[in-house]
């Protein structure tokens, strides 16, 4: 390869990446998922598009995709909070195992019939498209305001269900090559090894990497590079030992994100940019790999298979997988059924048969690509509407426009949050002494018209003021309500009810003050929170959980870390 060819590749690559970034600004205006933009640009630059680039190097695409996926999962794991595991670990694992098997099986049966394939070949297509995609889920869920149970379930499921899909795909390819039609008992042994090594090396490697980062002194810019190189090493090492590298790198990131670590916020900021670059490169490469004209040949059966996957296979897998978990409402189950987002992983898995030289490998790839495209276009674009329809959205709270970690010590949890006030903020005009700041938070600085003020308790806030608040991550919900864009009472009443009460309030006192009548005798020692938790029937509660009893809708309005702190109540026949 001469220098002119290398320069040409640099120019083409920079145009594709830069164009993807610039065009991504239109995705929200058009209501199209940003990942579709990246895929479309790759397809336009490909052999059937305006660019005319002939790219059919499957090993290179596989290399790029795996490297990108490792970075995306490392970043996603680091942003997954431990509270998410408390809320949705076991349901998510059920969906990541039983759910994937059901989805793959039902999809495989339909694929075999639609494309006239052997049952084992149909099952291979089902395995390829059987898992949801972490890149798509992390990208599309960020600003939708879903309740914690739904968000946690989707994030953990997408981060942990790829190993099952990978394992099924590799197993079925080997069976086709060897002429097998039945699984043997070694299937279970290999499955346990995949998950076991993934969990052990992921958690152990994450802990070891955290210890190294905290014990070595480096320039701040090098800590993110050390973290990402360590994560990729865990991915590669686990894969080399025939474990699940995908699960290992996700858990490695989870450990780093939930333990004290030096330069946490520098690492997170760098990871954010690296994850976006990884998504762009991965979807561009996969878009280049496909020949769009070939998709028309399988369009009708592939469309039918896509709809079967979305409307039959995925819903059945959700309802069966969540059968033991009674704390999921029907609305949540229906929403989870619809949001089975497919993304890069099915396309990457579709490369496996190409590299193995199977007879119908090109068809498998085209079908997987078509299903991903339909999933992103239909499910991705309708995600917000479906969430509102299923009523799994909770009232939003204001987020800081910027947050910076105060990395004085790895154990230091303090951060600086920046809030800017607009005319719609309810606290504009209020004196600082009237703000009910969360305990252990302080307003460190107040800027007005780009001038640093020296505020007193009597200083009144104005539109355009910028507040610098010192606090901890757990203070964000309370600060968000304090600086929300509409009066909190009106905002909360629309969702939580007419009255929002302390969960520690005595139930008998509440019934007496508000004129509530109970069919039975009220326990004098029972608090409002205990009463509602008993009605909900167990499980980890989340904000927005509600239950109708005694003619009243009881809704969890606020949680303080793991404890319910406020309950909303309204008459049951009152319109929401």
Curated annotation (Swiss-Prot):
Transmembrane region(s): 6-26, 30-50, 58-78, 95-115, 122-142, 163-183, 185-205, 221-241, 270-290, 293-313, 334-354, 367-387
SMART domains assigned: CorC_HlyC (SM01091)
Catalysed reactions, semicolon-separated: K(+)(in) + H(+)(out) = K(+)(out) + H(+)(in)
Domain of life of the organism encoding this protein: Bacteria
GO MF annotation: an example: flavin adenine dinucleotide binding
Intracellular or extracellular location(s): Cell inner membrane
Keywords: Antiport, Cell inner membrane, Cell membrane, Ion transport, Membrane, Potassium, Potassium transport, Transmembrane, Transmembrane helix, Transport
GO biological process: cell volume homeostasis
Span of domain RCK C-terminal: 404-485
Membrane topology: Multi-pass membrane protein
Keyword Iron in annotation: no
Pfam families noted in UniProt: CorC_HlyC, Na_H_Exchanger, TrkA_C
InterPro entries per the UniProt record, alphabetical: Cation/H_exchanger_TM, FAD-bd_PCMH-like_sf, FAD-bd_PCMH_sub2, Na+/solute_symporter_sf, NhaP2, RCK_C, RCK_C_sf, Transptr-assoc_dom
Entry's Gene Ontology cellular component terms: plasma membrane
Job description of the protein: K(+)/H(+) antiporter that extrudes potassium in exchange for external protons and maintains the internal concentration of potassium under toxic levels.
Family per record: Belongs to the monovalent cation:proton antiporter 1 (CPA1) transporter (TC 2.A.36) family. NhaP2 subfamily.
Name assigned to this protein: K(+)/H(+) antiporter NhaP2
Gene, per the UniProt record: nhaP2
